[in-house]
Every structure is written in structure tokens, then in C-alpha cells.
Amino acid sequence: MSNTDKERAIAAALAQIEKSYGKGSVMKLGQRPNIDIEAVSTGSLGLDIALGIGGVPKGRIIEIFGPESSGKTTLTLHLIAEAQKKGGTCAFIDAEHALDPAYAKKLGVNIDELIISQPDTGEQALEIADTLIRSGGIDMIIIDSVAALVPKSEIEGEMGDAQMASQARLMSQALRKLTASINRTNCITVFINQIRMKIGVMFGNPETTTGGNALKFYASVRIDIRRIGSIKDKEEVIGSQTKVKVVKNKVSPPFKTADFDIMYGSGISKEGEIIDLGVKLDIVEKSGSWFSYNNVRIGQGRENVKQYLKEHPQISNEIEKIIREKSSKITNINLDQTEEEND
């Protein structure tokens, strides 16, 4: 078959497919209108840089997992706030029945515009999510959490009844159904997940996430979030030092990490990240305990500089802009190459 005949045969096949399934159902990759991946900021400057595209990708499944009280819900509330700033409509499926509206408001979430559902069963939660995604009007949906998506059979059964892998089957079926809708409607779908311990693991990491393996495969980005220390004001604990690691990334190189502070009552400390990344990129100078910007001292001690940046937002925004411009030069934000690469 000559090249001309091949081209005619392909053109005829493409025309037949479009006739059967609609325009745009098949095309050459270079003809796609949006080749660049759009992203929504996470609310953390360091994590945006670690993700490689300035935030979480639109039209993809994201998994955020970690131990209890590590900042999973806080990070997702920041995601909602950032999406709303861009005019997006967000939904929160609260399967844990634990969302605090007052805390969400403090983090910048417009709770009057946030759609919330507190379903009774896992099937109900995922059906609600599917309906909202297929509507095409939702820009971001959060499901909190996978562990709380209890199958109907388990709720209606007796305590102690064996329900072998019923949650894993539910998640596998739901993700098969949701994936195409998520991509078509460009909706960011974030699953919060918990950590469990595998029994009898002698070597390697005994930790695993709930809900089986389906979510690990379908997720384009998986973020591991951990609390690594406390932030104290004299004797009072006022926040948590947090480390996040991008353990899977289909849109940029994975295994990058970022550190940030989560302050109780106000969420991720943007000013703390600006100081740390500013020093790392030689934008902010550090001499002893003093910090300087443009040869002007802006404070002694990290907490004082954070307060200075809060009081001078124009300087804070200026430093942040320079950090984002230089971020392409950062190949490493505490880059942590571990055994997980070989998992």
C-alpha cells in the first residue's frame, strides 16, 4: 500500500469514527487545542514548584495521603480557596462528617459558594461525585476520605461480618466510571486517603493506603504529607512543620519534596515559604539571625521576618514573583531520591 493509499485509508477510518462517536473523538495529538496542562495552585509555593507545573493539573485524579493530623484536609481547603480565587466552583464530599466551616473560612474558602454533601454510604458518595463531575459545572471536587467510603453492604451487615475487599471493588468500579468524565469536563478530583500498616512485613515499607490499588493507578499525582515537627512560641505549640513528597507525577518528574509550616488557625504559612525559598535562591540574604532583602534588613529571626512580610504584602509579592521566575532553575527542593522510586 502506497503512502497516499495509507493516508486515504486513515482519513476514511477517522471520518467513520467521528460519524459514530462525534467530532473530536479521535484526532492527531498535535491537533489537540490544549496541549499545555492547566494547573491550580496548592496554596504552597514550594509544593507548586515541586509539582513542576505550578500546582495540581486540571482534568486529573489527585491523591493526598498521610498519617492522622498531618495536614491533608488543610491542604485541600487551600486548594479550594485557590480554585475559588480563579472563579472556579468547588464541591466537598464529606464522607468523614468532620468538615469545620469556621476553619475553612479562615483558610480563605468562600463557604457560601462551596457545595457540600455528607453521604451515608460509599456508593452514595461516589454517585454524587459522578453526577457533579458529569454536569460540567464543577472545577474541583474533594472526597474526604477514601477510608470513610463504606460500602452499603458493610453498613447494612452485622458488626464483625467479613467484607472481603468490598471497598477495593467499590473504588475500582467507581474510578473506571469517573475517569472519562473527569478528563472531558476538566474537573480536578482530589481523594484524601489514610495510611494503614500491612501485617507481617519484615522488609520494606509496611505502610499502605486504604481502598485497594485502583486509586494508585488512576491518580496522575500522589502527594504524601507528613508532620515532621512542632512550631513553638515559648512553650505553646502554634503550628506544625510539614514535609510533602510527590511520590507519583504523570505531568512532571516525581520524587520532589517541599517543606512548609502549617500554623494552627491560619493554615499554610506563605511567608515562611517565601523566606526559606528566598534564602535558598539567594534572593533573601541571611547573616546570622538577620535577614535582608535588596540590602535592607527586614528582621531578626524567622518569626519576626514572617510578621514583617505580613505587614508589607508588596514586598512579599515581589519576592514570591522572583521565586516563581527562578523556580525553573531549582532542580531540587530538598530532593529526596529514595527506595520508593524502585517500588
UniProtKB/Swiss-Prot annotation:
GO cellular component labels: cytosol
SUPFAM superfamilies, A to Z: P-loop containing nucleoside triphosphate hydrolases, RecA protein, C-terminal domain
Alphabetical UniProt keywords: ATP-binding, Cytoplasm, DNA damage, DNA recombination, DNA repair, DNA-binding, Nucleotide-binding, SOS response
Main location: cytoplasm
Keyword Glycosyltransferase (UniProt): no
Gene Ontology biological process terms from the UniProt entry: DNA recombination; DNA repair; SOS response
Recorded family membership: Belongs to the RecA family.
HAMAP family xref list: RecA
NCBIfam families: tigrfam_recA
PANTHER family on file: MITOCHONDRIAL DNA REPAIR PROTEIN RECA HOMOLOG-RELATED, RECA
Name of this protein: Protein RecA
Species whose genome carries this gene: Rickettsia felis (strain ATCC VR-1525 / URRWXCal2)
